[in-house]
Amino acid sequence: MDNSIHSTDGPDSVIPNSNPKKTVRQRVRLLARHLTTREGLIGDYDYGFLFRPELPFMKKDPRAPPFFGLNEKIPVLLAFILGLQHALAMLAGVVTPPLIISSSLSLPSDLQQYLVSTSLIVCGLLSMVQITRFHIYKTPYYIGSGVLSVMGVSFSIISVASGAFNQMYSNGFCQLDEAGNRLPCPEAYGALIGTSACCALVEILLAFVPPKVIQKIFPPIVTGPTVMLIGISLIGTGFKDWAGGSACMDDGMLCPSATAPRPLPWGSPEFIGLGFLVFVSIILCERFGAPIMKSCSVVIGLLVGCIVAAACGYFSHADIDAAPAASFIWVKTFPLSVYGPMVLPIIAVFIICACECIGDVTATCDVSRLEVRGGTFESRIQGAVLADGINSVVAALATMTPMTTFAQNNGVIALTRCANRWAGYCCCLILIVAGIFAKFAAAIVAIPNSVMGGMKTFLFASVVISGQAIVAKAPFTRRNRFILTASMALGYGATLVPTWFGNVFPQTENRDLEGFENAIELVLETGFAVTAFVAMLLNAIMPAEVEEIGAVTPMPVSAHDNRDGEAEYQSKQA
């Protein structure tokens, strides 16, 4: 891959052989010069811009910092700082899904720590694939987008996993103790990742479908409400943890357990206060924080909550002390299997991931000052979706749930004006190192539920807003309002009352028929799957109303409407 300097005025593509290849000797000389000179190590970048808070009495600098394109030379220190900023921006999103999924299965703390470590390592390794972009030999196809797009664990799988686990505990796939509490069930996690590995083939096939066709089949009026329902179904998880945890909500129980350092009843004011502290800290970072604080405000809020919780005695250090010094992929394994009822919902997850990937990479290209139309752009989209699918297969084999392209990092690019891939590589390296040090994962697992709940509530609400932003791209005609109403009515209902379809089918002793009925039941009790199906069906059969064509002005959908965030930045500086 040629990483030579390109002009920021023209398209910055990664087409092979676009520049003469350098010899190994020339590359070594350039690297040595980059690492041994002040220009290469520090440069003349205004580092104060990243750390300067926006306080009311401080004078704002009207000058915009320089823009670093995809392949431009960038100082080593700046690449590391911005890589750290990208890593912090995605940290909460990377560790939250494995924490929720492992808690749903009552997995022991050592397995939870392993999954958090593996999540960080896998995200770092697979993000490198997405950022680098590989050409498939003797084909017009690529693997990877070639831009600063990072991979993270998909939130969409949490709702499917939660419903499937409930079904597994009720049908005997997983066991309960005499009191009705869930026993650890690693077999269920193996079924989840095994089914995901098979269903990821759907997204791989979608990568070879032209993006325009995908967007026609899954327009914003379909994907928007689906993403909204994913976030809505997860907010309840955050609120339960905010009040102490989902496993101790019954009367007379203490949270998180009777053996915890400071056990309290669910909903105690101490728990509410800790979560509220995290929530308020996030707001204060966004209002008064420096650019580097704004992009990682969720992590800073979590850190503030952890400090106060530790000072008040809510932390348990036993698991941290018992954790190994290092961890890696496959240190622990799970028995892989395919759970039939999960197939259809997980296929829906990968379709949503493909649609999200197209939108995220389009936004990344725009803020990176790259073309957002034409052959090169379409090849980036194809490579990104293909990398999404392949990475999900690899992630499943590495004991991790499905992966998707993260959108948080587009905000970091727009804010810092750095789209350089070397900042992305530094981000990947930081994630991998953080995952290898198992004590870091153990510290995350030991964070009190109320602190995590305040962070999760904010994080999952941002998923809802992302869905609303997608819906806003479609004109609000009568037809679209009807599709939204019908699809979200059933989706909301299934989310609020997830057991509404549980007694429709009679009991049967036919195992094959029971498996088919369980699959239908799981789909209809998963809110976002219901919304996606109804929206797709109505969008296909509902004709456009002639009197509304041209009468409604669509909201702008082009990513050029806020080119690389510069207009937003300048408006803030004014």
UniProtKB/Swiss-Prot annotation:
Record annotation: effect of changing Q408E: Does not significantly affect substrate affinities at 37 degrees Celsius but has no uptake activity at 25 degrees Celsius
Region (Disordered): 1-20, 555-574
Membrane protein topology class: Multi-pass membrane protein
Modifications made to the protein after synthesis: Ubiquitinated by hulA. Ubiquitination leads to internalization, sorting into the endosomal pathway to the vacuolar lumen where uapA is eventually degraded.
UniProt subcellular location: Cell membrane
Phenotype when changing G411A: Decreases affinity for uric acid significantly more than affinity for xanthine. Confers ability to grow on hypoxanthine
Top-level lineage group: Eukaryota
One function term, GO molecular function aspect: urate transmembrane transporter activity
Pfam families xref list: Xan_ur_permease
Transcription regulation among keywords: no
Outcome (variant: N409Q): Increases affinity for xanthine, but not uric acid, 9-methylxanthine or 8-azaxanthine
Signal peptide coordinates: none
UniProtKB keywords: Cell membrane, Isopeptide bond, Membrane, Transmembrane, Transmembrane helix, Transport, Ubl conjugation
Result of changing R421 to T/V: Decreases affinity for uric acid significantly more than affinity for xanthine
Chief location of this protein within or outside the cell: membrane
Linked residues for Glycyl lysine isopeptide (Lys-Gly) (interchain with G-Cter in ubiquitin): K572
Residues spanning the membrane: 77-97, 111-131, 141-161, 188-209, 217-237, 264-284, 296-315, 338-361, 427-447, 451-471, 482-502, 522-542
GO annotation terms (biological process): urate transport; xanthine transport
GO cellular component assignments: autophagosome lumen; endosome membrane; fungal-type vacuole; plasma membrane
Induction or repression: Inducible by 2-thiouric acid, and highly repressible by ammonium.
Keyword Lipid metabolism: no
Similarity comment text for this entry: Belongs to the nucleobase:cation symporter-2 (NCS2) (TC 2.A.40) family.
The protein's role, per its UniProt record: Uric acid-xanthine transporter.
Identification of the protein by name: Uric acid-xanthine permease
Species whose genome carries this gene: Emericella nidulans (strain FGSC A4 / ATCC 38163 / CBS 112.46 / NRRL 194 / M139) (Aspergillus nidulans)
Designated gene of the protein: uapA
